[in-house]
Structure formats: structure tokens, C-alpha cells
Amino acid sequence: MSQSDLESSMRKSVEATQRNFNTIRTGRANSSLLDRISVEYYGAETPLKSLATLSTPDSQTIQIQPFDISALALIEKAIAMSELGFTPNNDGKVIRINVPPLTEERRKEFCKLASKYAEEGKVALRNLRRDAIDKIKKQEKEGEFSEDQSRDAQDSVQKTLDKFIAEVEQHLATKEADILKV
């Protein structure tokens, strides 16, 4: 695994962690909160984004305008059944979700969830490091690398890992600040 391949893989892991962070509620409405909701539409699980336009008319409201009005009730049911704790309001044409301010207890829960997502991201990064180092050691064993080259390559992999873990930590700190901001 070349250094650029490793960095590319690690970048993807960081981006996946960032996407996970985006699904965590903060004090204001954000359409990405609904990214993980899928609706059973004509017998198939369909992402909500594919069925409707999501918008945030103000900081406390998410508005969902389905492309097909017949999907309105299905979308409403999927949102109500999700673990987000939202109560959708259906007016016959659009669904509005009022995003209530978070209680201190919920803020702490969401901080724990963000920490969990960050840890999952770091584990994924460490797994990539392990794979890269195993490959380097294998190449050393086969005689492609000298011992010094192997050590230098392993140090380079570790430095790359440290850089990306610091990035995940930075994203976590930013997300926690967003969550805790009243």
C-alpha cells in the first residue's frame, strides 16, 4: 500500500466519521439529521432524500416536500418510528418537523454518541495502519525492503495516522462545542 493510497483510505475514514457527526442533533435544525431515515416505498427501503426535498426554513424547523404526495404518510411514519424523537406535522402537502431545543441531559447523550463515532473512526484508522505495517513487514521479510527502510516506512505510516487521528479529534471537539452551545 503506497503512502498516497494509505492517505486516501484514511481520508475516506475521516469523511465517514464526519458524516456520522452530521447525523447528530445540535440545537438547531439541519436536514442532514434525516440522512439515515429510509422509507418503505413500494416495497423497497428508499432513502428519504430520494423521495422528497428537505429544507430548513428557520433554525428550529425542517420542512419535507415529497415529490409524490402519496408518499407523505409513509414519510411521516418513518420519521415518527426513527430514534430521533421528532414528531412530524403533516399538513397534506408538506411535513414540518419542529426541532426542540436540547435538554442538558440530551446534550450529554449526544456528546457521548459523538465520542463513540470518533472512536469508531479512530479504530478504522488504526486498522488501516495495521494493514499497512503488516504489508511493510511482509515486504521486508521478502527482501524488498531493508530493515532501515522498513522502519522508516512504518514511522511514516504512524505519522500519517497521527495526523488523521488529530483531524478526527478536531472534528469531535467542534461537534461537541456545537452540541453544548445553548
UniProtKB/Swiss-Prot annotation:
Transmembrane segments: none annotated. One of its GO terms (molecular function) is ribosomal large subunit binding. It is found in: Cytoplasm. InterPro entries: Ribosome_recyc_fac (IPR002661), Ribosome_recyc_fac_dom (IPR023584), RRF_sf (IPR036191). Its main location: cytoplasm. HAMAP family: RRF (MF_00040). Belongs to the RRF family. This is Ribosome-recycling factor. It comes from Synechococcus sp. (strain WH7803). The lineage of its organism: Bacteria, Bacillati, Cyanobacteriota, Cyanophyceae, Synechococcales. The gene is frr.
